[in-house]
A protein has these predicted regions:
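Non-catalytic structural scaffold of enzyme domains
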Residues: 1-234
Length: 234
């Protein structure tokens, strides 16, 4: 059984990541089962925002506390189930450093790694993110594989807060104007909308009812990357 630590910005989206992997466990063969660990970085949205805009030394201290303990406990795979977190910290460099420091092959799977290949498939793409720091990081990742890609982006923490507070998807879609956002992005030529926050799959079924564009959820592609790591570890 492969140990996987799920990191995200708040307890809510961390639990969403844990739930996502545990649903995958129910359909996976016995030799592909995961032991999923819950590792929130902050206690709520406000603390998460402060963390994301803190200096790199402070971020690293938080990450070291989580990673060092889990690596000591046999974890080699880390699943960053948070777009804004993956854009606020250099996990690529950190993955290499932790592998060197520990002498182990550490794998960190992030949404941004998925986006670096996703950009090749589109000419114009809409992005809805939790905040504009995240939207910027997603745009950079998408364009790293396609410099001609045109990104129509939006960051809206109000959507995240409403999800954390437990509002119904239909109410959030109405109050946050997501149907209007879809029409705006479609008018700008977007071919699809990327759900650039791991909270947003909570809205997906209801959003599809009012959305004229296909919705992209990167979580399944992240899981496929995790399974590749599983296979490599034998």
């Amino acid at each position: 059984m492969l140990k996987v630590s799920v990191l995200a910005g708040t307890p809510v989206d961390t639990q969403m990541g844990v739930d996502f992997l545990e649903r995958k466990n129910r359909h996976a063969p016995e030799d592909r089962q995961l032991e999923v660990l819950y590792r929130p970085v902050a206690v709520d949205c406000d603390s998460q925002i402060r963390f994301q805009y803190s200096d790199n030394d402070e971020k690293r201290q938080v990450m070291d506390a989580i990673f060092d303990a889990d690596i000591e406990n046999g974890v080699r795979d880390f699943f960053i189930y948070c777009n804004s977190l993956s854009g606020a910290f250099d996990f690529d460099r950190y993955e290499m450093q932790k592998s060197i420091d520990s002498g182990e092959d550490i794998h960190i799977i992030t949404p941004l790694k998925i986006y670096r290949s996703l950009g090749r498939g589109y000419r114009r793409l809409g992005v809805i993110a939790a905040n504009n720091l995240s939207a910027h990081s997603i745009e950079e990742a998408l364009m790293s594989s396609n410099r001609d890609l045109y990104v129509i982006g939006s960051g809206n923490m109000a959507i995240v807060r409403a999800i954390e507070e437990g509002y119904e998807p239909s109410a959030i879609i109405e109050s946050c104007g997501l149907a209007d956002m879809d029409r705006y992005m479609e008018a700008c030529g977007a071919e699809a909308i990327l759900l650039g926050c791991t909270h947003f799959p909570y809205l997906k079924d209801e959003f599809e009812k009012v959305c004229g564009l296909p919705l992209i959820d990167p979580a399944d592609m992240m899981y496929e990357k995790l399974m590749e790591s599983f296979i490599l570890q034998g």
